[in-house]
């Protein structure tokens, strides 16, 4: 699954011998990217949370006698009160604002909070920037009823109160700890929900629209992919002669650009794949045969899926060195451009690069960084992935060469990306993560790494800046994820590392003996 989906008129890229001009203002992008999908998911979740808060605010009206407080209370405050209970106390912060004298204001706060049974742990005051008055910040501990009573008393007894906000002291940690993510490779069965964007059955702009034979074939392959579960043997697919012909056309067309436009890592691994007859021009390779090769090289494997997944599910799969892969091919009418994920893109774009240990590690690192991450961080990681793993460039011998699979499998855009037409920026994950993605036509901007090693080093530095209440480690022996939150977790991780270092140290000592002998 390369995250390429597009509802626009398909471009015949084989007819574009030079870089195409960049057009702006097109409401229908050439492809719905992983970036677009992550953004949509973020907005969807924001909408759900907003609707929940509205509902919770309505429900709290029945529990609170003083309605004025609900009018002033912030959305997070509504959720803090709603989630609290009358048995255990919670820690929270309060910011209240008043136009009264500060001494009177603080006195009223302390009196009413104490009357309600609220424990005050910390108090700060400052001049208010919003009104002519003062803000008071309090760190508190209370039960739900105590919190509601304190809010009602203060609202009733301090008429100059203009603002009342409540914040959970551990809202970020709590929300992230509640985000589910797979802990074992078998749980990727729960990360295979396809997000349909661009189908020949519904979109007249799809090259296969109206082609009943192509539609039926695509459905057959997608249905097979949907049935796949962890532990199943990947089935043998009997591809048609038309599909083999489409594969061959793309394979041979791109071959003319390999030496001039692709990075040395890609060329080296492609030659090995060709030498071992994993990839040949005449026949579409079987996924299970490709997996045998990848497992020996980097431990990566392809898993059948039926199309574009959610950004969170797709990135989570990478954490286990699993790449979710479509099994259908683009329509034969448009062989040199795929506006959606298809098998040609996966095999010719991703497989040679996943054969490289550094690129494989970088992909897995992005996946590990995504586990339990907030929607905001998922969107940033999807953007980083898109701009470097899908459409990244590197410098070799003073020339721009493609490392991104989206470029390596698209003839016209490969030429465009390496030309002087678009803007090129040095790859910096912190900058890349917030770069707006545009794809009205060919992209106007590409990021360039000095090397794959350089990109990996920068990515790991960026990972250290991510705010997550836990760390994760992948155990390749059990194919599972371990979370590190305590010293006991850390000790377990160090124990495994110590065993590896012991073997390396022993090997180094043996080499010293051989050299001196």
Swiss-Prot record:
<dbReference type="GO" id="GO:0006585">
    <property type="term" value="P:dopamine biosynthetic process from tyrosine"/>
</dbReference>
<dbReference type="GO" id="GO:0043204">
    <property type="term" value="C:perikaryon"/>
</dbReference>
<keyword id="KW-0963">Cytoplasm</keyword>
<comment type="function">
    <text>Involved in the synthesis of catecholamines, such as dopamine. Has a role in serotonin signaling. Required for normal explorative and foraging behavior.</text>
</comment>
<dbReference type="InterPro" id="IPR036951">
    <property type="entry name" value="ArAA_hydroxylase_sf"/>
</dbReference>
<keyword id="KW-0966">Cell projection</keyword>
<feature type="binding site">
    <location>
        <position position="350"/>
    </location>
    <ligand>
        <name>Fe cation</name>
    </ligand>
</feature>
<dbReference type="InterPro" id="IPR036329">
    <property type="entry name" value="Aro-AA_hydroxylase_C_sf"/>
</dbReference>
<comment type="similarity">
    <text>Belongs to the biopterin-dependent aromatic amino acid hydroxylase family.</text>
</comment>
<keyword id="KW-0479">Metal-binding</keyword>
<keyword id="KW-0127">Catecholamine biosynthesis</keyword>
<keyword id="KW-0597">Phosphoprotein</keyword>
<dbReference type="GO" id="GO:0005506">
    <property type="term" value="F:iron ion binding"/>
</dbReference>
<keyword id="KW-0560">Oxidoreductase</keyword>
<dbReference type="InterPro" id="IPR018301">
    <property type="entry name" value="ArAA_hydroxylase_Fe/CU_BS"/>
</dbReference>
<dbReference type="InterPro" id="IPR019774">
    <property type="entry name" value="Aromatic-AA_hydroxylase_C"/>
</dbReference>
<dbReference type="Pfam" id="PF00351">
    <property type="entry name" value="Biopterin_H"/>
</dbReference>
<dbReference type="InterPro" id="IPR001273">
    <property type="entry name" value="ArAA_hydroxylase"/>
</dbReference>
<dbReference type="GO" id="GO:0005737">
    <property type="term" value="C:cytoplasm"/>
</dbReference>
<keyword id="KW-0408">Iron</keyword>
<feature type="modified residue" description="Phosphoserine; by PKA">
    <location>
        <position position="33"/>
    </location>
</feature>
<feature type="binding site">
    <location>
        <position position="345"/>
    </location>
    <ligand>
        <name>Fe cation</name>
    </ligand>
</feature>
<keyword id="KW-0530">Neurotransmitter biosynthesis</keyword>
<dbReference type="InterPro" id="IPR019773">
    <property type="entry name" value="Tyrosine_3-monooxygenase-like"/>
</dbReference>
<dbReference type="GO" id="GO:0048471">
    <property type="term" value="C:perinuclear region of cytoplasm"/>
</dbReference>
<keyword id="KW-0503">Monooxygenase</keyword>
<comment type="pathway">
    <text>Catecholamine biosynthesis; dopamine biosynthesis; dopamine from L-tyrosine: step 1/2.</text>
</comment>
<dbReference type="GO" id="GO:0004511">
    <property type="term" value="F:tyrosine 3-monooxygenase activity"/>
</dbReference>
<feature type="binding site">
    <location>
        <position position="390"/>
    </location>
    <ligand>
        <name>Fe cation</name>
    </ligand>
</feature>
<dbReference type="GO" id="GO:0030424">
    <property type="term" value="C:axon"/>
</dbReference>
<keyword id="KW-0085">Behavior</keyword>
<protein>
    <recommendedName>
        <fullName>Tyrosine 3-monooxygenase</fullName>
        <ecNumber>1.14.16.2</ecNumber>
    </recommendedName>
</protein>
């Amino acid at each position: 699954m390369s995250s390429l989906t597009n509802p626009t008129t398909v471009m015949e890229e084989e007819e574009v011998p030079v870089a195409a001009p960049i057009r702006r203002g097109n409401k229908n992008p050439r492809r719905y990217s992983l970036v677009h999908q992550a953004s949509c998911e973020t907005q969807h979740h924001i909408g759900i949370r907003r609707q929940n808060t509205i509902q919770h605010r309505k429900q709290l009206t029945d529990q609170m006698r003083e309605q004025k407080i609900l009018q002033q209370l912030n959305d997070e405050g509504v959720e803090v009160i709603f989630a609290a209970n009358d048995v255990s106390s919670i820690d929270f912060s309060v910011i209240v604002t008043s136009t009264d004298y500060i001494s009177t204001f603080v006195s009223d706060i302390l009196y009413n909070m104490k009357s309600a049974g609220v424990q005050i742990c910390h108090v700060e005051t400052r001049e208010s920037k919003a009104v002519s008055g003062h803000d008071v910040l309090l760190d508190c501990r209370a039960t739900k009823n105590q919190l509601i009573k304190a809010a009602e008393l203060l609202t009733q007894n301090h008429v100059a109160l203009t603002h009342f906000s409540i914040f959970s002291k551990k809202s970020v940690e709590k929300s992230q700890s509640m985000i589910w993510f797979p802990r074992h490779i078998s749980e990727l069965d729960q990360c295979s929900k396809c997000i349909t964007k661009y189908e020949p059955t519904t979109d007249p702009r799809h090259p296969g629209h109206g082609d009943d034979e192509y539609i039926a074939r695509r459905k057959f392959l997608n249905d097979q992919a949907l049935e796949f579960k962890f532990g199943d043997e990947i089935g043998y697919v009997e591809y048609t002669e038309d599909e083999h012909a489409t594969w061959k056309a793309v394979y041979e067309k791109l071959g003319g650009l390999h030496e001039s436009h692709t990075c040395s890592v890609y060329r080296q691994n492609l030659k090995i794949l060709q030498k071992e007859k994993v990839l040949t021009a005449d026949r579409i390779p079987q996924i299970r045969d490709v997996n045998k090769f990848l497992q020996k090289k980097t431990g990566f494997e392809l898993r059948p899926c039926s199309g574009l997944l959610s950004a969170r599910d797709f990135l989570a799969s990478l954490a286990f060195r699993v790449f979710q892969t479509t099994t259908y091919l683009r329509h034969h009418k448009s062989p040199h451009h795929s506006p959606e994920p298809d098998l040609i893109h996966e095999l010719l774009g991703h497989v040679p690069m996943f054969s490289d240990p550094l690129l494989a590690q970088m992909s897995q690192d992005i996946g590990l960084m995504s586990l339990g991450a907030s929607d905001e961080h998922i969107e940033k990681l999807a953007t980083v992935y898109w701009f470097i793993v899908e459409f990244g460039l590197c410098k070799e011998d003073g020339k721009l060469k493609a490392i991104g699979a989206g470029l390596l499998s698209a003839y016209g855009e490969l030429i465009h990306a390496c030309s002087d037409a678009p803007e090129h920026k040095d790859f910096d994950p912190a900058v890349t993560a917030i770069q707006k993605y545009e794809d009205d036509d060919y992209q106007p901007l590409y990021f360039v790494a000095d090397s794959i090693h350089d990109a990996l080093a920068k990515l790991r530095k960026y990972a250290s800046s991510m705010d997550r209440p836990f760390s994760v480690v992948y155990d390749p022996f059990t194919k599972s994820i371990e979370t590190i939150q305590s010293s006991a977790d850390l000790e377990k991780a160090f124990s495994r590392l110590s065993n590896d270092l012991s073997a390396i140290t022993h090997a180094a000592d043996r080499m010293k003996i051989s050299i001196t002998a």
